[in-house]
Amino acid sequence: MGCVQCKDKEAAKLTEERDGSLNQSSGYRYGTDPTPQHYPSFGVTSIPNYNNFHAAGGQGLTVFGGVNSSSHTGTLRTRGGTGVTLFVALYDYEARTEDDLSFHKGEKFQILNSSEGDWWEARSLTTGETGYIPSNYVAPVDSIQAEEWYFGKLGRKDAERQLLSFGNPRGTFLIRESETTKGAYSLSIRDWDDMKGDHVKHYKIRKLDNGGYYITTRAQFETLQQLVQHYSERAAGLCCRLVVPCHKGMPRLTDLSVKTKDVWEIPRESLQLIKRLGNGQFGEVWMGTWNGNTKVAIKTLKPGTMSPESFLEEAQIMKKLKHDKLVQLYAVVSEEPIYIVTEYMSKGSLLDFLKDGEGRALKLPNLVDMAAQVAAGMAYIERMNYIHRDLRSANILVGNGLICKIADFGLARLIEDNEYTARQGAKFPIKWTAPEAALYGRFTIKSDVWSFGILLTELVTKGRVPYPGMNNREVLEQVERGYRMPCPQDCPISLHELMIHCWKKDPEERPTFEYLQGFLEDYFTATEPQYQPGENL
């Protein structure tokens, strides 16, 4: 069954490896969305450096998940000397505009122009029609990217999150790029036993010099497809045989259409407000549609909340921030009342989710995982030299599968309301704000770290207001004198120690979000090997 070499010798144990440790937390990264996608590259110099440190430059992601320092050129590789690579649809897609093509999973395309990055001009071989298609909905025919089980540049933690989703049986699996070894892959499998219950095991797939693949040298394969076929028929030393590929969620689009990619000021008439989701100090949030067919979230701001000119300038930066733990900005209406159009998150704010929703029943592992997701998004903001300024559970949105995304980043500094700009006014979130920011207006990524520590208390207390029994003035005075919130009930000491670390008086002594992400992702697994040795491999 595709096995190139099988040697009759004692099974070799796979080397236990780790991608890193808590002291090397840079190895801990969330990958892109399950289907690799191309984001046009942009230099971080286009985003003002609000912090006093230098971050690494941004890189473009190639369309199949690799890293490239420049954006996609539009040149397609050839196959068989034909000069044309055919692509196949991985999902159904319904056209949003007259420029798009609707298509069904399995439909094949000839790509006519791929210079638009996220949107390619294509001709359907089924209908003969031409139009734009989202590039992360297709893959080359017969490539591993077209396989149901291939998830590309997906991080270890996100792989576990997807495999452990409700409804996946033991033996659900996926293959992803290795985070540590270039050219290698990782096989991740959902397993179960009496001691651990449901959990995920990871096996490294190594590449031979001649192009083959193996988990153990006893069984080598010419292709990943042959490897999957082999282990689908027998466990052969794995924790169990491969039963079914993990379900891929629909890939995220970073723009509403090919036209709004560059021209994302849209007419108010193209938006329909359908259901009010929330009402805040500065406006409302609605579930709505764009063009009558695309579900979006629409934040409407009260006139006078911020200058339209300042907002548009900030939105130029916000639009460039693209990460799967940040709520994606799609478009704006910049004339008052200002409308901000973003991706829709079905479960609403984390605060409401914890207090009144499904979040009331969540246990510590789920809560720590949600904190890790927020830290991952903030680590990206940290790398891009940006600042949130208003990080709290009310500004985190929740989607299906307990996915968390950061919203409203950067907007706080634009608010012109006197009750807010006074910083000690009634509308200012004193209880979440670092003392140097509340007293002197010194907002940096380190003041965001302080706020993250407060957000951790919201998670473990299921949405309790910080500093219970104290008003804003008392909080400012007590914190300046060195007071810090005690360990909440049922909160592990180690997690409270992390909060205290976030609340160091000297901002430079607070941890980075990169460290916080690694610590929280590994909170329950720090003593386990990164890769499984296998039993009889």
UniProtKB/Swiss-Prot annotation:
Subcellular location: Cytoplasm; Nucleus; Cell membrane; Perikaryon
Lipid sites, type N-myristoyl glycine: 2
Any GO MF annotation of the entry: tubulin binding
Region (Disordered): 14-35
Domain Protein kinase residues, every copy: 271-524
Post-translational modifications: Autophosphorylated at Tyr-420. Phosphorylation on the C-terminal tail at Tyr-531 by CSK maintains the enzyme in an inactive state. PTPRC/CD45 dephosphorylates Tyr-531 leading to activation. Ultraviolet B (UVB) strongly increase phosphorylation at Thr-15 and kinase activity, and promotes translocation from the cytoplasm to the nucleus. Dephosphorylation at Tyr-420 by PTPN2 negatively regulates T-cell receptor signaling. Phosphorylated at tyrosine residues, which can be enhanced by NTN1. Palmitoylated. Palmitoylation at Cys-3 and Cys-6, probably by ZDHHC21, regulates subcellular location.
Effect of residue 6 to S: Abolishes palmitoylation and plasma membrane association
Covalently lipidated residues, kind S-palmitoyl cysteine: 3, 6
UniProt-listed PANTHER family: TYROSINE-PROTEIN KINASE (PTHR24418)
Protein's name in the database: Tyrosine-protein kinase Fyn
Organism expressing this protein natively: Mus musculus
